[in-house]
Amino acid sequence: MNIRDLEYLVALAEHRHFRRAADSCHVSQPTLSGQIRKLEDELGVMLLERTSRKVLFTQAGMLLVDQARTVLREVKVLKEMASQQGETMSGPLHIGLIPTVGPYLLPHIIPMLHQTFPKLEMYLHEAQTHQLLAQLDSGKLDCVILALVKESEAFIEVPLFDEPMLLAIYEDHPWANRECVPMADLAGEKLLMLEDGHCLRDQAMGFCFEAGADEDTHFRATSLETLRNMVAAGSGITLLPALAVPPERKRDGVVYLPCIKPEPRRTIGLVYRPGSPLRSRYEQLAEAIRARMDGHFDKVLKQAV
């Protein structure tokens, strides 16, 4: 038995499909299947109920999967401890980002991070919050950049910046010539929202409910770009995070207005596992991002007025 065998087993438990599990481990399906059989022979116990339709684990198999996850987490800690003895900001680093942050933040920070930490090998992964936190907990990811939510409190949270949200309206909307919009003016309005699973949806809904607004349930978007296009088409209005707002106050049929009294904001932070030996690496990364983004949103809000 070796570490790779345990990785195959955990991958199969996660995907419940031999081909997808093999793809995630970057091996052929026969290789993964053969190693699982060897593991069963070595342990003298059946781990799987093999059917033609789906992968079913035996009770012994599920117990071994749970223990394998624990072993793999500890192996990752050992590797982190070893790498900590060398240069802190070098080697591989797997970073997770949520879809409402990654595409808009990365252009601002990636060139700077490559220049500041040239020996750091960054691997970027995009997924929704609950998926990223599960991958962080399992050790697949080293750290995650997301909007801080209750679920992230189980990890170490390092705030990076507070990101304002702006109101996006179509160009011939009655408010199009305003300089800003008090949140109270949204009372009675129905706003377009992202679909379930996006933390931004919950945050935007919270601000809307406090203002007396509601969700337009006729449509739920899968991305911020879809929301933006729906606004441009005159189908409604929405709140967009400032990172996703262009430099111009008006572009492609959409007008962006700052909201006031109160200003809706979300906190973007870097999250990592408690007790990680690479704490100083994450703290240095967070400080570099924080310095790069300092003052950025003041410029965005001024341009929107």
From Swiss-Prot:
PTM note: Disulfide bond formation between Cys-199 and Cys-208 significantly rearranges the secondary structure of the protein and activates it. The reduced and oxidized homodimers have different forms which may alter oligomerization and interaction with DNA.
Phenotypic effect of disruption: Hypersensitivity to peroxides. Increased expression of phage Mu mom gene, hypersensitive to H2O2. 2-fold increase in adhesion due to overproduction of antigen 43 (flu).
Modified positions (Cysteine sulfenic acid (-SOH)) in chain numbering: C199
Cysteine pairs bridged by disulfides in the record: C180-C259, C199-C208
Any one of the GO CC terms: cytosol
Stated consequence of mutating C199 to S/A: No activation following redox signaling
InterPro entries: LysR_subst-bd, Tscrpt_reg_HTH_LysR, WH-like_DNA-bd_sf, WH_DNA-bd_sf
Outcome when changing F209 to A/R: Partial H2O2 sensitivity, reduces oxyS induction
Regulation: Activated by oxidation of Cys-199 resulting in the alternative formation of cystine, sulfenic acid, S-nitroso- or glutathione-bound cysteine.
Gene Ontology terms, MF aspect: cis-regulatory region sequence-specific DNA binding; DNA-binding transcription factor activity
UniProt subunit comment: Homodimer and homotetramer.
Protein name: DNA-binding transcriptional dual regulator OxyR
Gene name for this UniProt entry: oxyR
